[in-house]
Swiss-Prot record:
Belongs to the prokaryotic molybdopterin-containing oxidoreductase family. Gene3D superfamilies: 2.40.40.20, 3.40.50.740, Dimethylsulfoxide Reductase, domain 2, Dimethylsulfoxide Reductase, domain 3. GO terms for molecular function: electron transfer activity; molybdenum ion binding; molybdopterin cofactor binding; trimethylamine-N-oxide reductase (cytochrome c) activity. The gene is dorA. Homodimer. It comes from the Bacteria. GO terms for cellular component: outer membrane-bounded periplasmic space. The lineage of its organism: Bacteria, Pseudomonadati, Pseudomonadota, Alphaproteobacteria, Rhodobacterales. This is Dimethyl sulfoxide/trimethylamine N-oxide reductase. Keywords: Metal-binding, Molybdenum, Oxidoreductase, Periplasm, Signal. Its cofactor is Mo-bis(molybdopterin guanine dinucleotide). Residues 1-42 form the signal peptide. It is found in: Periplasm. InterPro entries: Asp_de-COase-like_dom_sf (IPR009010), BisC (IPR006658), CT_DMSOR/BSOR/TMAOR (IPR041954), Molybdopterin_N (IPR041460), MoPterin_dinucl-bd_dom (IPR006657), Mopterin_OxRdtase (IPR006656), Mopterin_OxRdtase_prok_CS (IPR006655), Prok_Mopterin_Oxidored (IPR050612).
Amino acid sequence: MTKFSGNELRAELYRRAFLSYSVAPGALGMFGRSLLAKGARAEALANGTVMSGSHWGVFTATVENGRATAFTPWEKDPHPTPMLEGVLDSIYSPTRIKYPMVRREFLEKGVNADRSTRGNGDFVRVSWDQALDLVAAEVKRVEETYGPQGVFGGSYGWKSPGRLHNCTTLLRRMLTLAGGYVNGAGDYSTGAAQVIMPHVVGTLEVYEQQTAWPVLAENTEVMVFWAADPIKTSQIGWVIPEHGAYPGLEALKAKGTKVIVIDPVRTKTVEFFGADHVTPKPQTDVAIMLGMAHTLVAEDLYDKDFIANYTSGFDKFLPYLMGETDSTPKTAEWASDISGVPAETIKELARLFISKRTMLAAGWSMQRMHHGEQAHWMLVTLASMLGQIGLPGGGFGLSYHYSGGGTPSTSGPALSGITDGGAATKGPEWLAASGASVIPVARVVDMLENPGAEFDFNGTRSKFPDVKMAYWVGGNPFVHHQDRNRMVKAWEKLETFIVHDFQWTPTARHADIVLPATTSYERNDIETIGDYSNTGILAMKKIVEPLYEARSDYDIFAAVAERLGKGKEFTEGKDEMGWIKSFYDDAAKQGKAGGVEMPAFDAFWAEGIVEFPVTDGADFVRYASFREDPLLNPLGTPTGLIEIYSKNIEKMGYDDCPAHPTWMEPLERLDGPGAKYPLHIAASHPFNRLHSQLNGTVLREGYAVQGHEPCLMHPDDAAARGIADGDVVRVHNDRGQILTGVKVTDAVMKGVIQIYEGGWYDPSDVTEPGTLDKYGDVNVLSADIGTSKLAQGNCGQTVLAEVEKYTGPAVTLTGFVAPKAAE
């Protein structure tokens, strides 16, 4: 390969790209199958069966004449999900990105292109060489012109399982070699909790192993699912789920354990258990917990010994609770006025919890709202007052609803994976001169709107960098980020937006350069089974050959790195199977040291799976060692204790996050002060997809209402607006407007509508501010503000709106097919 340096390389890459564009219309022969061969590593079977896995579980694929025809759940899966039908359909969906595409305006004018027309579908098909040259040239241009602060590599999303084809890590690996980038901190799922919990209990907590389900079945007398719906959300996993939560849930049911669900919506978990159902107004959880805590103090019921021996700062919280500091005692009656839950119910629950072995299992939606840090902090405070933390079946848990939390752990080794190659930046001199190298991930729009502006985050103050390029893989920010219209406008600040995906998501449609990635089922990989259990290691074998011109993310980034003169550093001389073998061999070495024998790699790959035994994981009790001896087993907090009052947070001096759990009015809430709109939207996790994944598949036909995302509405609210079941409605507020299809049901409380998050944004006119979203992306309506200066998490659950029957012209949905130019 000819060696270029500096501006010569950049100029050569641009020359190749634009030369290819000039001949592409008359050179269709360049788009032949030869391009597929570059992405192939081990051939897929033409006919037969092959085991693989996904976010939805382990399965066996049937292949006939090179086409996958069926996905059959693993025989050891205790609760297979019907979403596997959509997983199969995703391979052949009409949303597939077939070829490398470049937005015509960008291809012709580069950084001088009109950015307001992003998303209009006007793309040009290009060759892989042209596309890769253009990507490499843009990365090099931005790095050389603006430095690493000009590149946002904090690409966020659920991607796909696999330790090699971890596209977000691969992106950062390439960008590190290219010169550095701005990263994102945290996530959208637990943005507030994962920042506040280390101050309170010394760990992230939201991703920690929970007291094992068998321990709960044996010891728990009252199981409380607070804003958690594990029957629904346990279908999926960050890695490959073993669905181990379901036997635990079934054991609780068989035992006759009393189950209470606190949620504005009648959830799948309520229905499964026939549970007692408490329906608070959304965003009022902290007030209810304070009312319970006040009852425990007023009736002299709380566990004073636990508070004295295992917590710090209760004496500073108590005056607030009792109203001595603000003349407002946080009584059950006070909490009832805010939450709508009867005061006597709040008192009865407090008495029940203290009298029985109680597990408070909280979900994450309660912290995805304004002042979301307070919810889990107050939950831990309430659990501390109950005094059962560290006892079998008691205390609190923050991940019983997520990826099989509580499923007994095995003694198997950890599986390593590809790394990002090191630090994200060139060094501290850049940080001092150009702002933060890491921003809170949900503040990406603030960053684009306010380059150079200061922002607070968890005790630090930094400046937003001036980002000119964003590179996104494995995610869908044009669905998962809040306040879509504001976001679309902010995205115009970017000179270049590059996306890899296998489907035409709303994010891909808004890109300048779109590269077709393979699905997980068109490449080889390796992954853990069970986020918490570590049940085994699965060979994720290629099921079918890559469709159209799709290539794996690894091959794409390796090719970009090669064009930047960093190919050897990126690949380290390994191909796909070489990396996979190295990860497995490392795990086998760990296993041998720990007394776990594993087969040689070739035998493992032939078998497809290795399983590990459960030893003592079924008896695990979270915080048991801390309870046994807090001096020998302290928490990772400054005091080593549960910090009900945090001196570190006090020193930060934030006006929106006091030093102890506090009720704080959100930006807007149902029946709250100055509420402009009458309905709260519960933007819940969907039942039939993973966030936005699988929305572009056949599964949508089973839940869409007249083609639109469903909107669950209470009969009284529907009748008051002249709305009937099945009507298409316009849901709107000051931030935007969307169409949805109504399902009238008493599963939602009056004053609340439920629209699942993850619906694909389908704007009527991308150039029109505030345009109507035709399908039903709820984040068009949600507020894009930080939870507080502490965590800066997202507030996707802080949203009020109004609903009216849609009487406008008929709309044609265009979001679930490829743009015409890309067909």
